[in-house]
């Protein structure tokens, strides 16, 4: 039996032998198309080639493209697990011709692949063509020898493909496999076409027209070919299955899920196993391609998929995280074809574990609430949109998760009500924002750009320039003039000032002009991409529209910012080399006094790893190698090994910054990144690099803080001063501070143990002599002062043993707070409840409740001064 890996290799090898370039799958996040959530077909990475905006060094290509359909226009999430052929993740095999061959050769290749390479019987195949595409019908007859009755003309738009409202378009031809009369269903175009007998396996798109304004269409000068064949569907046919989930790759994941959960893969939880198998693939590949769970955009779609799988794990009785345990099974199945999966395995595993652990408590509470609400519904009633929104807003339940849970009970959600609740929340948020005054000012920047255009940036080559004031904004509105004392936003026709973007803070400096004009600039922002807004205060003179001015950037501050920005590039590459290529930038700040760099990394970065990274960056600084910048197309940059931020939209030309001597074959520099910021001339200009902190930002994201140059020297000097001061206090040499502190800590530990032992003996000694009676019951009530709260329970148990029968109430006032423990001997728990007594004590010290068992409970409160009142409250409660 041909495995999925065999099928993929056979397909690609055939087209490689026939003059096609084998192109790697693009990442699931489109490199240069923020309008598309995820790559959902093989042609996405070639979109600009088809439209003529990009040229490649080949005119024929073949790929096995990773695809995700979840969220947005193409969303299969709700159906996954319940049907034989819906997936959030799938692979699309395809061959492409960019103005090279057309219909005849495309049909020839397709027929050769399905009948010769894969050995499908010709009598089991039929095709569809667009109703007017006589050429395709004729070619299928002559090349494949198909009779007329197995060439079906389709009049619907299903067999005519368009890239958009305008642009390349053309008829399609689809190849179908016939499973035979024992399977229900009719041929395409028939009333029973949705049955499983006839399955589409390959779609050939003949791009031969250019769609213009409505009603206009012209022939393309260079017709092209775009084809797509789902690997999972083809595998089902070749492996003799009617269900994609029974094919080798997905079945292996289902079996792994069954082994981990102890649930029969084909039993009552069959659907849940299928959901877990599919969602494991989509979540893992998305994370391997740089997407991490969050509450917005692509990250939120990823989180929705994860949480749907987590609910199905819950349905199978899993009380511990499941998905992360299945990652090795996925890597075994698909790691050979997709190396990025292997490289990101630790990131995927840890992120899944963290997400599952954190969502578990919310899932339990949310499902309990959902169960309560459903219990209030009558037969056939839908769940209100307000309740569904509360589940979303409070417990993190995406709407589709709630719908999925109700679907199993034959119920639905009032989606319109949910949407209304969501709209109302957004309306309130907008109202709060617009009330701040920011909204009113945003419109000004659109008006400025429409009226006078953007600003030309000169800051890569100079820090000083002549310019003209083209717009002034004061108090949120356009103005013609700005006198001395005015807080003003100045827009110039050109500027050397860098506007805050890409993590680099904006420049500061001075604008001067005729008649004593002097404006102190405290910040520079970039609006709408190319409107540079200089924020400052008119110190003297009168600023006017059309006025010629001289602008000068604060050189010392800019130099410090440049050093920090260049250091982040070296840091990024050093982290990837030390921790793995799963490390990707998730955010940054490059300021004059520090840098902050957020990266995808599932676990804390160890002190040893940080030391290695810091040393490597400093070695690169000492190289004093030149920092080079070049302009090229995004595709050229990526081909050279430049790192780009997935999901960012880049123009036709990008700025590529490279630095450091190369250490990797085929890569011309140590670090190569797409970057629009300002940088040092040589790595030596950074001076010194020092990591100051490492912490968590969110699940799967770590933050590194560091300083460079003079800021690093200042910090080292401060650390040295503190070390000398500490050594002086300890009366040892600086080199002996660590040994002396360790010795003191050990001495303290021994003294604390001795003190606790003395307090324990003091508290329990002579218990019988210090016992009072309340209603004929013995009570040992004591204020123990600074005794550690953690000691109270053990002391209460010891005193209770001495009493044999009675109640113990102990209060500690350590650390300025009251801690209370109440114990009741077993023979009295039918008369006195320790929880009730401790809650009375808690109220006296300003606490809110308390908890425990009938024989032992504890509580606390902020008012340590009322410790004796707490003991009296216990007496009163016993006497009541």
Swiss-Prot record:
Q: Where in the cell is it found?
A: Cytoplasm
Recorded hits in PROSITE patterns, A to Z, give: AA_TRNA_LIGASE_II_ALA
Give the cofactor note: Binds 1 zinc ion per subunit.
Q: Which SUPFAM superfamilies match?
A: Class II aaRS and biotin synthetases, Putative anticodon-binding domain of alanyl-tRNA synthetase (AlaRS), ThrRS/AlaRS common domain, Translation proteins
* Top-level EC class: ligase
Task: Set out the biological process GO terms recorded for this chain's protein.
Answer: alanyl-tRNA aminoacylation; negative regulation of DNA-templated transcription
Question: Which CDD domains does the entry link to?
Answer: AlaRS_core (cd00673)
Disulfide bond sites: none
Catalytically driven reaction(s): tRNA(Ala) + L-alanine + ATP = L-alanyl-tRNA(Ala) + AMP + diphosphate
The protein's matches in NCBIfam families, at most eight in alphabetical order, are given as:
alaS
Q: What is known of its domains?
A: Consists of three domains; the N-terminal catalytic domain, the editing domain and the C-terminal C-Ala domain. The editing domain removes incorrectly charged amino acids, while the C-Ala domain, along with tRNA(Ala), serves as a bridge to cooperatively bring together the editing and aminoacylation centers thus stimulating deacylation of misacylated tRNAs.
Q: What does this protein do?
A: Catalyzes the attachment of alanine to tRNA(Ala) in a two-step reaction: alanine is first activated by ATP to form Ala-AMP and then transferred to the acceptor end of tRNA(Ala). Also edits incorrectly charged Ser-tRNA(Ala) and Gly-tRNA(Ala) via its editing domain.
Q: What is this protein called?
A: Alanine--tRNA ligase
């Amino acid at each position: 039996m041909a495995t999925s890996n065999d099928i993929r290799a056979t397909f690609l090898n055939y087209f490689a032998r026939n003059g096609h370039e084998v192109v790697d799958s693009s990442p699931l996040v489109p490199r240069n198309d923020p309008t598309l959530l995820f790559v959902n077909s093989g042609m996405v990475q070639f979109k600009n080639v088809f439209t003529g905006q990009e040229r490649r060094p080949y005119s024929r290509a073949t790929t096995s493209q990773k695809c995700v359909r979840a969220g947005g226009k193409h969303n299969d999430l709700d159906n996954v697990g319940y049907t034989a052929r819906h997936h959030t993740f799938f692979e699309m095999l395809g061959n492409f011709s960019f103005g090279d061959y057309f219909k005849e050769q495309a049909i020839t290749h397709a027929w050769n692949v399905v009948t010769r390479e894969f050995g499908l019987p010709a009598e089991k195949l039929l095709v569809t063509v667009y109703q007017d595409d006589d050429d395709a019908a004729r070619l299928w007859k002559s090349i494949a020898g198909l009779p007329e009755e197995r060439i079906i003309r389709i009049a619907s738009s299903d067999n005519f493909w368009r890239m958009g409202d305008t642009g390349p378009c053309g008829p399609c031809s689809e190849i179908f496999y016939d499973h035979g009369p024992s399977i229900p269903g009719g041929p395409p175009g028939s009333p029973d076409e949705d049955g499983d007998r006839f399955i589409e396996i390959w779609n050939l798109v003949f791009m031969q027209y250019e769609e213009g304004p409505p009603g206009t269409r012209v022939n393309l000068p260079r017709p092209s070919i775009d084809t797509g064949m789902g690997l999972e569907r083809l595998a089902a046919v070749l492996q003799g299955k009617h269900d994609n989930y029974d094919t080798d790759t997905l079945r292996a994941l289902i079996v792994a899920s069954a082994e981990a959960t102890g649930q029969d893969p084909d039993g009552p939880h069959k659907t849940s196993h299928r959901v877990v198998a599919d969602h494991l693939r989509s979540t893992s590949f998305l994370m391997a391609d740089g997407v991490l769970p969050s509450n917005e955009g692509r990250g939120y779609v990823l989180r929705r998929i994860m949480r749907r799988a987590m609910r199905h794990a819950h349905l199978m009785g899993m009380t511990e995280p499941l998905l992360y345990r299945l990652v090795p099974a996925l890597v075994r199945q698909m790691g050979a074809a997709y190396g990025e999966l292997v490289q990101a395995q630790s990131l995927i595993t840890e992120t899944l574990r963290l997400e599952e652990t954190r969502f578990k408590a919310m899932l339990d509470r949310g499902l309990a609430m959902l169960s309560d609400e459903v219990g209030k519904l009558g037969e056939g009633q839908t769940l209100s949109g307000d309740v569904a929104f509360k589940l979303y807003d409070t417990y993190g339940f995406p709407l589709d998760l709630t719908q999925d849970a109700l679907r199993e009970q034959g119920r639905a959600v009032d989606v319109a009500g949910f949407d209304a609740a969501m709209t109302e929340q957004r309306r309130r948020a907008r109202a709060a924002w617009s009330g701040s005054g920011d909204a009113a000012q945003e419109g000004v920047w659109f008006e400025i750009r429409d009226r006078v255009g953007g600003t030309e940036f000169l800051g890569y080559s100079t820090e000083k320039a002549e310019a003209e004031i083209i717009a002034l904004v004061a108090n949120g509105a356009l103005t013609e003039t700005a006198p001395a004392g005015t807080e003003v936003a100045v827009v110039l026709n050109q500027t050397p000032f860098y506007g805050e973007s890409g993590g680099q803070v904006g420049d500061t400096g001075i604008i001067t002009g005729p008649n004593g004009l002097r404006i102190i600039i405290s910040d520079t922002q970039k609006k709408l991409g190319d409107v540079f807004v200089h924020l400052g205060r008119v110190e003297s003179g009168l600023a006017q529209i059309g006025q010629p001015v001289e602008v000068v950037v604060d050189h010392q501050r800019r130099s410090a910012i440049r050093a920090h920005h260049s250091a982040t590039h070296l840091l990024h590459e050093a982290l990837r080399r030390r921790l793995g290529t799963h490390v990707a930038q998730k955010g940054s700040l490059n300021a004059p006094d520090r840098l902050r760099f957020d990266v995808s990394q599932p676990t804390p970065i160890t002190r040893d790893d940080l030391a290695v990274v810091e040393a490597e960056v400093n070695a690169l600084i000492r190289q004093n190698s030149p920092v080079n910048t070049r302009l090229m197309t995004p595709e050229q940059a990526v081909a050279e090994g430049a790192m780009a931020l997935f999901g960012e939209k880049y123009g036709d030309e990008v700025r590529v910054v490279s630095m450091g001597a190369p250490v990797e074959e085929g890569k011309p520099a140590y670090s190569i990144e797409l970057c629009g910021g300002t940088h040092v001339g040589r790595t030596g200009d950074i001076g010194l690099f020092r990591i100051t902190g490492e912490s968590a930002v969110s699940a799967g994201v770590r933050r590194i803080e560091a300083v460079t140059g003079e800021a690093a020297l200042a910090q080292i000097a401060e650390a040295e001063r503190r070390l000398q001061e500490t050594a002086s206090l300890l009366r040892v040499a600086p080199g002996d501070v660590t040994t002396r502190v360790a010795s003191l800590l050990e001495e303290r530990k021994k003294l604390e143990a001795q003190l606790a032992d003395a307090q324990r003996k003091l508290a329990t000694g002579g218990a019988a002599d210090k016992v009072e009676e309340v209603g004929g019951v013995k009570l040992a009530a004591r204020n123990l002062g600074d005794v550690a709260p953690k000691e109270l329970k053990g002391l209460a148990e010891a005193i209770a043993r001495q009493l044999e029968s009675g109640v113990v109430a102990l209060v500690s006032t350590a650390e300025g707070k009251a801690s209370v423990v109440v114990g009741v001997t077993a023979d009295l728990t039918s008369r006195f409840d320790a929880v009730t007594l401790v809650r009375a004590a808690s109220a006296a010290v300003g606490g809110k409740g308390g908890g425990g068992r009938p024989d032992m409970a504890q509580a606390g409160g902020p008012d340590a001064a009322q410790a004796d009142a707490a003991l009296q409250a216990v007496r009163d409660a016993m006497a009541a």
